[in-house]
A protein has these predicted regions:
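Glycine-rich phosphate-binding loop plus the immediately following alpha-helix
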Residues: 123-218
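Active-site rim beta-loop-alpha module in soluble metabolic enzymes
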Residues: 177, 185-223, 227, 232-273
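Glycine-rich phosphate-binding/hydrolytic loop that grips phosphoryl groups
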Residues: 275, 316-339
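Glycine-rich phosphate-binding loops at beta-strand->alpha-helix junctions
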Residues: 29, 289-307
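Short glycine-rich, Thr/Ser-proximal phosphate-binding strand/loop in the N-terminal lobe
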Residues: 20-57
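A short acidic Gly-Thr/Ser loop motif
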Residues: 23-29, 155-160, 179, 296-299
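Short glycine-aspartate micro-motif
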Residues: 20-24, 76-78, 152-156, 293-294
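Short beta-strand-loop/turn "lid" adjacent to the catalytic site in phosphate-handling enzymes
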Residues: 69-133, 168
Length: 339
């Protein structure tokens, strides 16, 4: 099921007087873009995430991926993501929420004053534990700018999915779910790995995904009205199909579906996807037709959009272009001296 097409007015024009090099430096990968006159001229990528860069070698890696771009006069380099973590180039302390783009731009960690800056992450205090974001804040700023919004609810699915609420241009709340990492562990490193396909599905299987999703969305049974069907050992409680969902039990069900040859290994990968995403989404509440901005890869957009529509929400999808737009928003804020 495709996400709904909604027409928005053209996004606000970005005005930046300086050449901009935007760098999205993750744990295992590195992406960079040259932006001139608010347009992406060229993109480059490598597998030199922060975990593969030796201490003190970050300047060399940056020079390698940017090469001729550094020759532009008065070029501004903005770096987001894990380069600002304790394991990265230099620590860029978290900014505690609530945070505006102006506050964020005013608290860049400058490696070279007004030449090379690292965008700080965000932190928030929840009742049970603090939560943090590094890198997604740039994507959020870009998504809002592209859609001409200053208030929105967003989900950024990935290894660690982020749910973010922005009101009047201020990051008010966010929460993190280890959905992608949990899925990967179950698929590749648990007992399920013996029965699931080792490769990713070639295409989205909505039927399989819905089967996993429904395991979480089923309602709690009315025990008083439970009836027994069948006779002897074949008796079954009809309410079992409406039992209270339990993650640990449902995960094992993926294995037994394979043991009894109910579905093939490829099918069960999408069942598992639906299951873990369903548990993530059940922590959220949605108004009918509420717009939820989904920022992520094409594959993750498909999974989350389908699930959100099942729950009555209206997903709006954006990809990697939101990252580069977010860096431009920060650069414009710096450029205009309104940080």
């Amino acid at each position: 099921m495709a996400s709904k097409k909604i027409t928005y007015p053209p996004p606000p024009i970005i005005t930046i007087t300086r050449p901009l090099i935007a760098v999205d430096w993750g744990t295992t990968s590195l992406r960079a873009a040259l932006i001139l006159n608010a347009k992406v001229q060229e993109e480059r990528s490598s597998d030199q995430g922060i975990m593969s860069v030796a201490p003190g070698d970050f300047p060399n890696v940056l020079s390698q991926i940017c090469s001729q771009w550094l020759d532009f006069e008065d070029v501004l380099i903005l770096i987001g993501g894990m380069a600002g973590s304790a394991q990265g180039w230099q620590l860029a302390p978290y900014c505690p929420c609530p945070v505006s783009v102006h506050y964020l731009a005013n608290h860049l960690h400058w490696i070279n004053p007004h030449k090379i800056g690292i965008v700080p992450g965000l932190s928030i205090e929840h009742e049970h534990a603090p939560d943090v974001i590094r890198g997604e804040e740039v994507q959020v700023l870009g998504a809002l700018s592209m859609l001409g919004k200053n208030s929105a609810r967003l989900v950024l699915p990935g290894t660690h999915s982020k749910w973010v609420e922005v009101r009047e241009g201020v990051f008010e709340d966010f929460s993190t779910y280890m959905t992608g990492e949990f899925f990967s562990i179950l698929k590749d490193h648990s007992i399920l790995s013996k029965t699931l396909s080792t490769s990713s599905p070639l295409e989205f299987n909505a039927e399989a995904f819905d089967k996993g999703l429904d395991l979480r969305l089923k309602s709690k049974p009315d025990r008083k009205n439970t009836k027994l069907e069948g006779t002897g050992n074949n008796q079954a409680r009809t309410a079992n199909t409406m039992r209270k969902p339990n993650l640990l039990h449902d995960i094992f069900g993926i294995r037994t579906l394979a043991l009894f040859d109910r579905h093939n290994p490829e099918y069960l990968v999408d069942v598992l996807s639906g299951l873990v995403i369903g548990y993530e989404l059940q922590t959220q509440s949605f108004r009918k037709n509420e717009e939820i901005i989904v920022v992520g890869t094409s594959a993750l957009q498909t999974y989350y959009s389908h699930a959100l529509e099942r729950l009555g929400a209206c997903p709006i999808t954006l990809g990697s272009e939101a990252t580069w737009r977010g860096f431009q928003v920060i650069a414009q804020t710096i450029d205009h001296g309104i940080a």
